Design a protein with these regions (language model features):
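Structural recognition of the conserved hydrophobic beta-strand(s) that form the central parallel beta-sheet
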Residues: 144-145, 178-185
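A short alpha/beta connector and helix-capping loop motif
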Residues: 156-170, 179-180, 226
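C-terminal regions of RecA-like/P-loop NTPase motor modules
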Residues: 1-5, 9-15, 23, 44, ...
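Conserved inter-motif catalytic segment of the P-loop NTP-binding fold
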Residues: 63-156, 276-282
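Hydrophobic/aromatic beta-strand patches that form the interior of the parallel beta-sheet core
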Residues: 38-40, 64-66, 115, 181, ...
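Cofactor-binding loop segments of dinucleotide-utilizing enzymes, especially the Rossmann-like FAD-
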Residues: 68, 185, 220
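The Walker A/P-loop phosphate-binding site
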Residues: 1-86, 274-282
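Short, well-ordered alpha-helix to beta-strand connector turns
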Residues: 35, 59-60, 109-110, 212-213
Length: 282
């Protein structure tokens, strides 16, 4: 055991924030921090996987991305669309004609290493992290788990399994001093209001909200090209459990672009509303 000052002296990251990539989130004091478990929860098709992908690309920190819920082809097309500004349809056509079409663009993704096991166990996650440390001499600063439901539990009880996994991820964040960003589902949206608005904290599936330091819920309005991001739990900043206080980002998911409420973001929103799918200088 240690006294508090000595324990504090041995902590390297001290909940160090990862880079802000959207001013709208920074204005709400929403920050992903090292040594902490953070959660992004949303209904299906709200864009949580794309949100995590774009954040990981733009944050530009050493990242280990467990893409269990999203397959290699989908990630490839989304990543290529984001770094090129092309629509995902254009990416698919370009790759069909030349599988190396986007190789030069993927230099922007060199900080991310991928694992595409569709149902990893906690032991599998730990083995991959150890392999990363052995290869690069340090742990990643960001570990993304997409998503919690895909991680294999050691019990047949779903809720007990989810809670046990979250406890392991909490321990993982402490030991690696990485930000562990876990994606998760919410319960049926009809119980908690409109699907275009972020769900309440109580909507999180499995009631696993105790351990994360930060929980964001997402509400996506495809007709308006808006993504609302609410901090329903935030140990280091303001939050509202009912998701009534949120940041708004502007998006064009067809081109895997997420922006602030600035000139570029407003263009994304206009294009989404007009059905235009891509062709951006990024």
């Amino acid at each position: 055991m240690l006294d508090l000052s000595r324990a504090w002296g041995g902590v390297l990251t001290r909940a160090t924030p990862l880079p802000d990539v959207w001013a709208g989130l920074a204005a709400k004091e929403i920050k992903f921090r090292r040594g902490q478990v953070c959660m992004v929860a949303a209904a299906p098709n709200a864009g949580k996987s794309m949100f995590a992908l774009v954040y990981a690309i733009k944050a530009d920190v050493p990242t280990l991305f467990f893409s269990a819920d999203t397959d290699t082809t989908t990630v490839m097309m989304r990543a290529a669309a984001h770094v090129s500004g092309h629509s995902q349809i254009s990416v698919e056509n370009n790759l069909a004609n030349d599988s190396h079409y986007y190789d030069s663009r993927f230099e922007k993704l060199g900080h991310i290493k991928w694992v595409f096991d569709s149902s990893p166990s906690i032991d599998d996650l730990e083995l991959e992290i150890r392999a990363y440390v052995e290869l690069y001499g340090q742990a990643p600063e960001l570990i993304v788990i997409d998503n919690l439901m895909n991680v294999t539990a050691e019990t047949d009880n779903e809720w007990a399994g989810l809670r046990a996994i979250m406890m392991e991820l909490h321990d993982m964040a402490r030991k690696t001093e990485a930000c562990v960003l876990v994606l998760h589902h919410v319960s049926e949206q009809s119980e908690y209001g409109s699907p275009i608005n972020p769900p309440h904290r109580r909507a999180i599936h499995g009631k696993v909200s105790q351990l994360p330091a930060l929980i964001l819920t997402l509400g996506y309005d495809p007709s308006q090209g808006t993504l609302k991001v609410a901090a329903v739990k935030n140990r280091f900043g303001p939050h509202t459990a009912d998701a009534s206080n949120y940041a708004q980002l502007l998006v064009n998911y067809a081109a895997c672009q997420i922006g602030d409420e600035d000139q570029f973001g407003r263009m994304l929103r206009r294009d989404t509303m007009a059905g235009y799918q891509g062709g951006y200088n990024v």
